[in-house]
Structures are given as structure tokens and as C-alpha cells.
Amino acid sequence: MKKTILTLAMALTMGSAWAAKAWNMPITITQPDGTTITVFQHGDEDFSWYTSLDGTILNRIGNTFTPITESKEAFFTKAKKIRRANVMRREPVQGSSQAIFPHTGSPKALVILTEYQDKKFSIKNPKRSFNQYLNKEEGKQEEFGYRESKNYGSVRQYFSEMSNGQFTPQFDIVGPVTLPEDMTYYGGTSSKGNDERTAQMVVDACELVKDSVDFSLYDSNNDGYVDLVYVIYAGYGQSMGAANNTVWPKATYVRSQAEYNGKKIYRAGVNNELIGNENTFNGEPAITGLGLFIHEFSHCLGLPDFYASTLTSSIYDNQGMEDWSVMDNGIYKYNGWIPTAY
């Protein structure tokens, strides 16, 4: 496959927020009564659901799983309405220059490491670990005790290889900073089935670093908008089976009138610190795979999801790229540590 596929970004615009699909591996979850259950998660941010190993559809309330009481047909009829509402209620992303991150040269992106009031980073020195995760120019990553060396290369190396050296993004990391609210405030699932305040997380993170960051350095075309603000948040992400009050990783947009050094925030992305949930690797925290950041960052470049994006397709005939593209399930190859190409 030609590595010049990044040039596709020139012709694409973002129509809505884009999110990683659910991790399709068996997930072990400890329920409040101490029992464990192994489930599969399906779908994406717009609507996700769980099944047992024998295919029974399960309700999830907190970490308690029970079989649905309605028929499968009734469940998915309701699910389609919820998903459709989630897609339709979004404001279309503008097709102007601020909608897409530059995709040639070495543009800079601002990355903010954020903790919650009730959840801190498990990685002892997250800035050190994520600096090599994002920016290491060659060779293996150094091991600091959180499986960093499992990641193949770095995000920057990945895009350099995919573009034959034409695109080598730079990631300026600040933080960690502590958000003003608990995790549930930002990640708690609404009645519509998705995160409540992801964009607010981005704005709050910007407020916390505004005195130490010159945001004008991140507007490459001087159009008045920061090219990208990316947040890596402490803990686990909902797409990999963590609790419903965690944030689902995604690329999104921010509707805010706030200005920093004369620049507005618009394009944003977020993803989690760690792989899986509290039971993954016997509870030993492990840094998230490169694939997750690469997938969401690719949305910021203008690339769409390649997985089945309609509920009917994902239920009955999921004939997507699967493991053959990082914009589908290739995001999670070898836990995302060795993601596939486009």
C-alpha cells in the first residue's frame, strides 16, 4: 500500500466527532459482588453494547452486568434510534482551514496531560513516557516499568514512515495538570449514551496551562485557530472496557469563545493513559498503545473511520478493513503497540 495515503487528508473534511471503535478482545470485569465476568464490547461512542461469551446481550450499570429483559429485536430497534440521535445532534464541523491539522512538514501540536480530582496518572513520570511515545525519532522506546518498550517506534516515526518522510509532526507536551472536576463529570455517560463533557475537558485543560503556553505557536497558517489541542487523560478509556464514567477516546471540536494569545480552540482530540481496565495484565498499569493516538490524530488530519459506522452493519455484516487498517481494528493490533498501516 502506498504510503502517500496521507495526501487523502487534503480532500477530506470532518463531518462530526470521530471515535475509536470498541476493543474487540474478551474483557474481564470485576462486579461489585466480587465476581468476575468476561464480556465482549461492541460499537463505538455513539452506541456501544456488551455480550457474554455465548452471545447474550447484557445491560451494564456501573460494573454490574445482567441479561437484557427485552427481545434482541426490540433492543436494537431502540439502539438505532439512540445512535441516530447522537449522530444527528452534532453540529457539523466547518469545512474551513481550522478543521484539519496540517499534514506535511513538521507542524507542532499541543498535548496536555490531565488528571482528575479523583484519578491521577499511574505512570510515575508521564511526561517522560509520553514524550518518547510521541516524539522518539528512531529505535525502541526505553522501558520505565509500564510496558513502554512494547510500543514499536513512536507516533512521529509512524507518520514519517507512512509519508516517506514528508510528514514528521512535533508534539509539545505540558502538564500534568489537575482538572477542576472528577472523572465522572467529564466521562459520565448521558441518557443519550455518550460522554457528557469531553469538549469541556479540553477547555478546562487549556485554562490550566494558559499562563505557561504560548498558543500562538500552534496556529501554523495564522487563521486565528490553534491547529490542535490534544488531551491525554489519566487512567483507562471506555472504548477498552473501562467503566462507563471514563471518557471514550475521540477526535472532536470545541465550541468556545475563549481566546488564548489571540487564538481560539477548535480542533481537539483525547485519549487515555492506560490499556484496558483494572483487570488487564493482572492489574499492572500499562501505557496505551500507539494505535489509539494515531487513530484519533488521523481524524484530526481529516481521515474517516474505516469500520462499519452504521448499527445494522456492525451487528449483522461487519465487512470493514478490520485488522488491515489503523482506521479500523488495526488500531488495536498487539494491544495497539504495533498498529497496522492505513
Question: What residue ranges belong to the model's regions?
Answer:
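Sec-dependent N-terminal signal peptides
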Residues: T4-T13
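A broad, structural surface signal
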Residues: L6, V203-E207, G291-H299
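Alpha-helical interaction segments
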Residues: L8, E148-S149, Y316
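Zymogen propeptides/activation segments of proteases
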Residues: W18-G269
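Extracellular hydrolytic enzyme modules, especially secreted metalloproteases
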Residues: L228-Y230, A234-Y342
